[in-house]
């Protein structure tokens, strides 16, 4: 039992170490809308721990956004650099934005990468931009909390499963030990009974045969045959609670026994 417990403890330690390595490896998940990410549920893993969002056409303000892992970019020289492009009006636009958290590039708002359109829009546009930032911050916080719960569940479920498995193994071992002990006790009792009945039967059979041989020999002409043997036989039969229907008679001079 101690050996099995030590094996189970070592197995749990190895599982925890493997989970720690996986969690600290540096890979994060990113939202990906490329064609090769359809099969993986519009998600990808980044070994560089970076996700990106960029405009398909940096010269067009209304250009759609594309998202993915930074590893999938063909050119790695300009990774996470603030590249500036200019549209038709000449205002600078960030063509690439990087982040380093799980699903941090999952933003469906067009104004994530779109700056304000100039000072001419006035104070209202500035307030609208601040509101958009607050909304984005709230979305990021909600996503972070969901990811935190997801990580906790990923860690807790295997540990709980391992503990339940250990408890089931310990319960099965205990049941097997008790069953084995009970079977051994039954076997010992059966062997002792067989041994006692075998030796007791042979000893009683030998005593009865000896008494029969002794009682077949007469003591004298017309005297009772083996009075001592009769007493011993009656004592043995009374001890075993067996009633005998045969009584030894008188020995006659013709050399035969009479039964009553």
From Swiss-Prot:
Gene3D superfamilies, sorted: CD59
Subcellular location: Membrane
Residues in compartment: Cytoplasmic: 174-260
Record-annotated membrane-spanning stretches: 153-173
Gene Ontology terms: biological process: cell migration; negative regulation of BMP signaling pathway; negative regulation of osteoblast differentiation; negative regulation of transforming growth factor beta receptor signaling pathway; positive regulation of canonical Wnt signaling pathway; positive regulation of cell population proliferation; positive regulation of DNA-templated transcription; positive regulation of epithelial to mesenchymal transition
Residues that carry a glycan: 87
Any one GO cellular component localisation term in the record: plasma membrane
This protein's UniProt keywords: Glycoprotein, Membrane, Signal, Transmembrane, Transmembrane helix
Residue ranges, Extracellular side: 27-152
Annotated GO MF terms: frizzled binding
Matching InterPro entries: BAMBI, BAMBI_C, BAMBI_N, Snake_toxin-like_sf
Membrane association type: Single-pass type I membrane protein
CDD domains named in the record: TFP_LU_ECD_BAMBI (cd23576)
Span of the signal peptide: 1-26
Main location: membrane
Family: Belongs to the BAMBI family.
Described purpose of this protein according to its UniProt entry: Negatively regulates TGF-beta signaling.
Name this protein carries in UniProt: BMP and activin membrane-bound inhibitor homolog
């Amino acid at each position: 039992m101690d050996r099995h417990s030590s094996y189970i403890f070592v197995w749990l330690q190895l599982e925890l170490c493997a989970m720690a390595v996986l969690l600290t490896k540096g890979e994060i998940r990113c939202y990906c809308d490329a064609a090769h990410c359809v099969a993986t549920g519009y998600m990808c893993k980044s070994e560089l721990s970076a996700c990106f969002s960029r405009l398909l056409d940096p010269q067009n303000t209304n250009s759609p956004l594309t998202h993915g892992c930074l590893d999938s970019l063909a050119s790695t020289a300009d990774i996470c650099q603030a590249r500036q492009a200019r549209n038709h009006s000449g205002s600078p636009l960030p063509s690439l934005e990087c982040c380093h958290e799980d699903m941090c590039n999952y933003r469906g708002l067009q104004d994530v990468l779109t700056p304000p359109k100039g000072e001419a829009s006035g104070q209202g546009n500035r307030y609208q931009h601040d509101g958009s930032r607050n909304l984005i911050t709230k979305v990021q916080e909600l996503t972070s909390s969901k990811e935190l719960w997801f990580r906790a569940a990923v860690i807790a479920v295997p540990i709980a499963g391992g503990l339940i498995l250990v408890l089931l193994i310990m319960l099965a071992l205990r049941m097997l030990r008790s069953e084995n002990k009970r079977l051994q006790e039954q076997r010992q009792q059966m062997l002792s009974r067989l041994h006692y009945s075998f030796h007791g039967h042979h000893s009683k059979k030998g005593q009865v045969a000896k008494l029969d041989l002794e009682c077949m020999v007469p003591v004298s002409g017309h005297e009772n045959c083996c009075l001592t043997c009769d007493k011993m036989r009656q004592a043995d039969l009374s001890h075993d609670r067996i009633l005998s229907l045969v009584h030894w008679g008188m020995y006659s001079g013709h050399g035969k026994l009479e039964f009553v």
